[in-house]
């Protein structure tokens, strides 16, 4: 058996960090088991689904390193769903209902007032053909419900009917079908709700494992019943915890909250996003994995907490810095070249500045410092200006090396009596225009004698 998983986003908005958790969980599970990953667009809602969102999802996944083995669109598979509908109708497992939303709401309130569970009472099963014809003559069109197998022979005498599965994340799970309403699978206009196309596609595409958010736990009992009604063996299920904002609010792709695209545009490294999306809310320590192979080593569905996890952007900042600070030159080289940073000193430059980067784009500033003019003249007081002028008069001749800074500052200390911060800070400001930054012993060599002299105040 080839492990086959799927990520099935609706292209009705941009995917966010919570969706990323699901996509990466499936991708990593398939990767660890030599399996296949299907990207399946749940675009049956023709009105709200947009091609621009589908394209954006593909771009976001590719940026994260997720490359599907197969891409499918549910909007191209309506004929397959229609055949499944007919199969269920023929088996007497899909029945027509004519209630309006208002009528259903009144019935729900009626049951609640009598302390009864607010489940659908299957009143439509009592309709005669003549009554159905009369309702349709009024202009009503039926929606179609799946008859849950929660009875022996009389559908109005429901009984406790447990559906069990061994969840990859949550362990043994049980839901009672008697506590649920028969789900609507087909709307009045003939369009499909999520459930039926999802099950039909999972069967048709050979999906063996479904890994998704724990907001789908209750749905699983219904879906297992539909799998069996269609003559298929249900796949293995795993329900991971959900991510929330730091304040505990749910994430929504329609509001753009923490969208993958916005994180990319903000300059975060894809592996920083992937590492936090996967490791937060688990028993694993949240560390930055340099690549997907390393992240896969820390990925374990059994380590996921059953409680929701809060996504803290400050943790993302820390992971991003960690990745940049440890990034080898060979990995950074193509990106540096794309920014025009190349030549004999590119490697020593990268090794000098990487420990001070929050975003990769910060390298452009430091390249300007070592290769061009300072963006702004350093703000030095009169006393510090005189000190720096004196210090620059003591600059040693080239060639310079890693010891030049030490020998120069020792000479300056002897000549001026300054030491510590009073010595180093004015020199840093004069050389870089910044109060903080990479080690000056490394930068001085990169700046070189002539450029250093040109910065004499």
UniProtKB/Swiss-Prot annotation:
CDD domains: GluRS_core (cd00808). GO terms for biological process: glutamyl-tRNA aminoacylation. It catalyses: tRNA(Glu) + L-glutamate + ATP = L-glutamyl-tRNA(Glu) + AMP + diphosphate. Belongs to the class-I aminoacyl-tRNA synthetase family. Glutamate--tRNA ligase type 1 subfamily. Keywords: Aminoacyl-tRNA synthetase, ATP-binding, Cytoplasm, Ligase, Nucleotide-binding, Protein biosynthesis. It is found in: Cytoplasm. GO terms for cellular component: cytoplasm. This is Glutamate--tRNA ligase 1. It comes from Brucella abortus (strain 2308). ATP binds at residue 253.
């Amino acid at each position: 058996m080839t492990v086959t998983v799927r990520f099935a986003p609706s292209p009705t908005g941009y995917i966010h960090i919570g969706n990323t958790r699901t996509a990466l969980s499936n991708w990593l599970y398939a990767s660890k088991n030599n399996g296949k990953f299907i990207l399946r667009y749940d675009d049956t809602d023709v009105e709200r689904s947009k091609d621009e969102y589908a394209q954006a999802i593909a771009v976001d996944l590719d940026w994260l390193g997720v490359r599907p083995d197969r891409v499918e669109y549910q909007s191209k598979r309506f004929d397959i769903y229609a055949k499944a509908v007919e199969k269920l109708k023929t088996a007497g497992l899909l029945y027509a209902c004519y209630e309006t939303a208002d009528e259903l709401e009144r019935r729900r309130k009626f049951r609640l007032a009598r302390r009864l569970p607010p489940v659908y009472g299957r009143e439509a099963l009592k309709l005669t053909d003549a009554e159905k014809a009369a309702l349709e003559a009024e202009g009503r069109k039926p929606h179609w419900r799946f008859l849950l197998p929660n009875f022996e022979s009389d559908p109005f005498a429901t009984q406790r009917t447990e559906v069990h599965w061994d969840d990859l994340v949550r362990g043994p799970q049980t839901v009672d079908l008697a506590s649920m309403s028969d789900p609507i699978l087909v709307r009045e206009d003939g369009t499909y709700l999520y459930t039926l196309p999802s099950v039909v596609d999972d069967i048709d595409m050979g999906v063996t494992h479904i890994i998704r958010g724990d907001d789908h736990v209750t749905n699983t009992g219904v879906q297992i019943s539909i799998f069996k009604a269609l003559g298929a063996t249900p796949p293995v299920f795993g329900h991971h915890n959900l991510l929330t904002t730091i304040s505990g609010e749910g994430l929504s792709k329609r509001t753009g909250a923490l969208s993958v695209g916005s994180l990319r545009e903000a300059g975060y490294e894809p592996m920083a996003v992937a590492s936090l999306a996967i490791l937060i809310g688990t028993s694993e320590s949240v560390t930055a994995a340099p690549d997907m192979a390393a992240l896969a080593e820390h990925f374990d569905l059994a380590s996921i907490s059953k409680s929701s996890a809060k996504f803290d952007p400050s943790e993302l900042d820390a992971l991003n810095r960690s990745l940049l600070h440890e990034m080898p030159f060979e990995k950074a080289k193509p990106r540096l070249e794309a920014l025009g940073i190349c030549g004999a000193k590119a490697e020593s430059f990268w090794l000098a500045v990487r420990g001070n980067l929050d975003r990769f784009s910060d390298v452009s500033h430091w390249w300007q410092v070592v290769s061009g003019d300072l963006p702004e003249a350093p703000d030095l007081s009169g006393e510090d200006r005189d000190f720096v002028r004196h210090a620059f008069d003591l600059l040693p001749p080239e060639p310079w090396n890693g010891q030049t800074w030490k020998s120069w500052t020792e000479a300056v200390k002897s000549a001026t009596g300054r030491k510590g911060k009073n010595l180093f800070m004015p020199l840093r400001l004069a050389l870089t225009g910044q109060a903080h930054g990479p080690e000056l012993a490394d930068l001085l060599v990169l700046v070189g004698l002539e450029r250093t002299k040109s910065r004499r105040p």
